[in-house]
Amino acid sequence: YASKEAYPFDKFKVSKFNTPTTKRAIEKEEILKIMAADLSDRDFYTRFSRDIFVFSYLGAGINFTDIALLKHSDIKKERIYYTRKKTGKIINFKLSEQALEIIRRYASPFYGDDDYIFPILNKTEHTTPLQIDNRIHKVIGHVNSKLKKLGKEFGIDNLTTYVARHTYATVLKRSGVNIAIISESLGHSDLSTTQIYLDSFENDQIDEAMQNLL
């Protein structure tokens, strides 16, 4: 075998490559197909999972935990105001007609301001932080399982709730929205986190552009 002297890079430290974030965004056209799909003959959880996915996309990329914690008191004049659990940032976004329709679909006819919007948490059953976290963890597992099955029908690999968040950010970037505004709407603590979301999109653009080099 080769001696150490014969290995010219021995004195250099070879650092591990930073593993990039897995590409999670999908095309806007794919989102629209998911939204338009007729799921009337499917089970409740499949329909619910699609609705949560669409609500996240239309709701400025709101993540599953924050969706689960939303209460009717968070709705003010067709806007949602909530505090992002992960960063503590206060976020608000306008509710589109499609998002309002999803809310109406799951609202109890006798709901109060203190009731959760979506049937994920029950205010009488899930009272401690541990009970709330466990319930959210359990439901997101079911939702993502249904989304992955649904995604396969549309030729989309690994469709999860987080794909909606990443796609929201990517669609805004493609529309020319400033990254600082996207970052603010996502509730990120700094721009570098948002950049990670958008890197795969920019890499795709570079790959496409490089087809024209020769």
What are these regions (language model features)?
Residues 10-11, 69-105:
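Conserved tyrosine-mediated DNA breakage-rejoining catalytic core shared by Y-recombinases
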Residues 55-56, 70, 171-172, 185:
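Short alpha-helical segment immediately N-terminal to, or the first helix within
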Residues 31-32, 96-156:
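Active-site/catalytic core of tyrosine-dependent DNA strand-transfer enzymes
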Residues 94-97, 101, 105-107, 199-214:
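DNA/chromatin major-groove-contacting recognition/catalytic segments
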Residues 3-64:
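Basic, Lys/Arg- and aromatic-enriched nucleic-acid-binding interface segment
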Residues 73-79, 156-158, 177-196:
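Short, polar N-cap/turn motifs at the start of nucleic acid-interacting alpha helices
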